[in-house]
């Protein structure tokens, strides 16, 4: 994912590694952790900040690299938690997995079969075209567009380390019901379930079956872990949030109320029903005295997360007033936090 999109890359003569970053709204935003040894990260961050003439932030920093940013004078705030699965312990057995197990059994009874797809195989073009169609249908139904920064793309047009798992009906002879694109996590011997798509009328249990089959397949191949990705703004429980009370209030307000264009609650609930073995915190680090509205705006822009089309999608005339009311409340809250930070 770090090699996709319109990112730039910083290297230092003093460190074997690099930072992926993007400039947005006058800010420099680092994508995830520095790619280097933990012991070398402070030096790489220091060189990077010295080379930039703008405020610097880093989105989705892990606890492993958090101290490196703190050593270089960065403040930080928790922005959500990432769902992590230990593949050696992954199972559908037990009471807590009853709903997921029932969904997978339903899909199997309906003839849904999961296989790995290779986009550059000789006979792959037909399925590639169908994958694109399913993706566009899903995005249109959700009122979304492809997000960026730390989310990958479908990438069917170029060879890569991505792996594609496809669920097809009629015992693998029918249409594509849904699919998942996985990205390798080299440092942890695992994979990230990056892009998940399904038809609007997909067989019930399709995505649950995909997730379970992917985990079983990767475990059998000797991989250690799977990440379902970040649940943004969910489970904000870091004690240091008290140092950023206004922004914390704003994030919790957005999580509870602002779910028209980007359903934070739904993202969390979907991950939570699989009962991850760990919820790892992720942070936004910044080298300013306070987390400014400008930095928040830059982060939203670089992720391409909110658009007017998204705000109004899937809402009729009766719902439009409610949407604008929520949007206005969000803007008022944002401005209040900004004014109070001065």
Please place each PLM-identified region on the residue numbering.
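Polar low-complexity intrinsically disordered regions
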Residues: 335, 339-342
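Flexible acidic/glycine-rich loop/turn elements at helix↔coil and beta-strand↔loop transitions
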Residues: 328-333
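Inter-domain linker/hinge segments that demarcate the starts of reverse transcriptase
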Residues: 43-45
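Short, glycine-rich nucleotide/cofactor-binding loops
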Residues: 35-40
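A conserved beta-strand-loop-helix scaffold within acyl/acetyltransferase catalytic domains
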Residues: 1-34, 59-77, 82, 88-103, ...
């Amino acid at each position: 994912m770090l090699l996709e999109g319109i990112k730039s890359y910083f290297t230092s003569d003093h460190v074997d590694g690099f930072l992926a970053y993007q400039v947005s709204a006058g800010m420099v935003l680092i994508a995830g952790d520095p790619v280097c040894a933990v012991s070398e990260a402070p030096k790489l961050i220091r060189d990077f900040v010295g080379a930039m003439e703008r405020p610097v932030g880093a989105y989705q920093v892990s606890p492993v690299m958090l101290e490196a940013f703190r050593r270089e004078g960065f403040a930080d705030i928790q922005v959500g938690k990432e769902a992590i699965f230990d593949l050696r312990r992954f199972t559908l057995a037990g009471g807590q997995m009853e709903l997921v197990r029932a969904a997978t059994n339903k899909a199997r009874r309906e003839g849904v079969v999961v296989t790995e797809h290779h986009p550059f195989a000789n006979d792959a073009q037909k399925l590639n075209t169908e994958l694109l169609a399913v993706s566009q249908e899903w995005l249109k139904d959700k009122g979304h567009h492809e997000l960026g920064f730390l989310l990958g793309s479908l990438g069917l047009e170029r060879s890569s380390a991505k792996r594609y798992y496809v669920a097809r009906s009629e015992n693998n002879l029918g249409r594509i019901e849904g699919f998942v694109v996985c990205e390798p996590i080299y440092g942890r011997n695992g994979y990230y379930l990056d892009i998940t798509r399904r038809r609007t009328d997909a067989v019930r249990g399709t995505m649950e079956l995909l997730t379970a089959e992917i985990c079983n397949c990767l475990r059998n191949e000797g991989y250690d872990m799977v990440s379902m990705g970040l649940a943004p703004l969910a489970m904000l429980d870091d004690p240091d949030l008290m140092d950023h009370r206004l922004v914390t209030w704003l994030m919790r307000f957005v999580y509870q109320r602002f779910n028209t264009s980007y359903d934070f609650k739904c993202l969390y609930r979907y991950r939570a029903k699989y009962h991850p073995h760990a919820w790892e915190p992720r942070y936004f680090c910044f080298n300013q005295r306070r987390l400014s509205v400008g930095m928040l705006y830059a982060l939203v822009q670089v992720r391409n997360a909110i658009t007017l089309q998204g705000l109004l999608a899937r809402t009729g005339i009766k719902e439009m007033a409610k949407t604008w009311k929520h949007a206005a409340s969000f803007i008022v809250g944002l401005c209040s936090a900004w004014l109070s930070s001065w």
